[in-house]
Amino acid sequence: YTAIWHFADGEYEFSDKSFRVKTKSGVGIKMIHTLESTAVYRADEQHFQGFRCNEVPGVFWPLPTAECEKNGGNTRFVTIFEPSPDGEYNIESVEAGDAVDDDKILVSLKNGRTLRINEKDYFVED
């Protein structure tokens, strides 16, 4: 896979079984091209999960559904990708940004497949 995320701010961390972003607002990712959407991701042994809290600008939800909905948002859940049979994500490299778009993060996994975010902020896997 190659996965592309856009970060509003903060640091990113990767390990074999987890993906975490530390931002000024909390743990999460904000899609900068859709300012009214936020996204939070967590990993477990089953799959890599994505949550998006809509309609609550600028807020990150470490625990997605309940707090998001309590504050007037709605949460969309997506499974981004499954781990390999040994339970690891086989991350090969992480590349941060370029001169034109320095908030872009490219995550290359060893199986070579591609994951991207399309113009509507949905996740599309090639």
What kind of feature is each model-predicted range?
Residues 1-126:
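CBM-like, beta-strand-rich accessory domains located in the C-terminal region of large
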